[in-house]
């Protein structure tokens, strides 16, 4: 095991194959916060959900917090904000209530703890004292569009942006032959094979944000495929070119001298 090592920066997947690994499993998950790219996201009263959950005590968001998003992470952020002293917490969603992605369990407990919800509101700007949203309407095609001229200002002391997470792009950018889909998730076969031979993947990096139970179930299935793949590879008969080189022996006197120093 080699901890505290980021693959995709100094060390790449290509380096792993060079150093003798026969297959690689990517289970990096989605730990990079997605931004909305609207004005005000860099203000001091704004936190990204994944950063807030990692160290909520580091943020000073006041007693009236807006949470943008209605997924499981957004529910965690809302409930954590209440535990940190916020008196009012409101979740905002671009679509209607039927489109909540959080589990019913998470939503029900958030409501019990006092979390409010505003639906069909699309944030267009964050300010130090709140956020500006436009109303959205559902079209015949099922898509929600913003209503021009419907802007409304909602006062808040702090804002948490929790609109899902993305994968770390360096892993893909530095590895030849790996393809992703339109959402930036890794493209794999049913048994977890990516488009690069010997590279397998599973979990959130493939399915999007899911539960730990689902990720573990997929990982077990992919592990079987990896084992079968490695067993199918021809035996490595290449001789070690440095097998017969001399081994330097440190003189005992040098060791004693260093110890005395």
Task: Give residue ranges: language-model regions.
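Phosphate-coordination loops involved in phosphoryl transfer and adenosine-cofactor binding
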Residues: 4, 61-65, 86, 120, ...
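FAD-site-proximal beta/loop scaffold in flavoenzymes
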Residues: 42-62, 144-209
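General small-molecule cofactor/ligand-binding pocket signal
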Residues: 2-4, 47, 116-118, 132, ...
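A conserved FAD-binding loop/helix module that cradles the flavin
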Residues: 202-232
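Feature captures the FAD/FMN-dependent oxidoreductase FAD-binding
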Residues: 1-39, 124-133, 158-160, 165-171
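Rossmann-like dinucleotide-binding cores of NAD(P)H-dependent redox enzymes
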Residues: 1-3, 78-123, 234-252
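Rossmann-like NAD(P)H-binding beta-loop-alpha module
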Residues: 59-87
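Cofactor-binding loop segments of dinucleotide-utilizing enzymes, especially the Rossmann-like FAD-
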Residues: 70, 93-96, 204
């Amino acid at each position: 095991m080699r901890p505290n090592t980021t693959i995709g920066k100094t060390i790449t997947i290509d380096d792993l194959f060079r150093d003798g690994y026969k297959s690689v499993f990517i289970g990096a998950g989605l730990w990079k916060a997605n931004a909305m790219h609207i004005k005000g996201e860099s203000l001091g009263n704004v936190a990204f959900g994944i950063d807030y959950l990692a160290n909520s005590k580091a943020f000073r968001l006041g007693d009236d917090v807006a949470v943008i998003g209605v997924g499981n992470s957004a529910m965690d952020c809302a409930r954590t904000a209440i535990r940190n002293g916020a008196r009012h917490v409101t979740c905002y969603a671009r679509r209607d209530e039927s489109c909540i992605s959080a589990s019913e369990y998470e939503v029900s407990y958030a409501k019990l703890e006092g979390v409010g919800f505003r639906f069909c509101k699309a944030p267009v700007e964050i300010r130090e004292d709140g956020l500006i949203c436009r109303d959205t309407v559902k079209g015949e095609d099922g898509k929600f569009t913003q209503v021009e001229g419907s802007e409304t200002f909602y006062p808040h002391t702090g804002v948490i942006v929790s609109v899902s997470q993305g994968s770390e792009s360096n892993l893909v950018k530095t590895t030849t032959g790996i393809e992703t889909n339109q959402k930036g998730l890794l493209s794999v076969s049913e048994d977890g094979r990516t488009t690069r031979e010997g590279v397998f993947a599973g979990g959130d990096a493939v399915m999007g944000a899911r539960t730990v139970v689902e990720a573990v179930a997929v990982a077990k299935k992919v592990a079987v495929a990896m084992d079968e793949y490695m067993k199918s590879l021809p035996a490595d008969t290449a001789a070690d070119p440095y097998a017969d080189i001399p081994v330097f022996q440190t003189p005992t006197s040098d060791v004693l001298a260093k110890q005395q120093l």
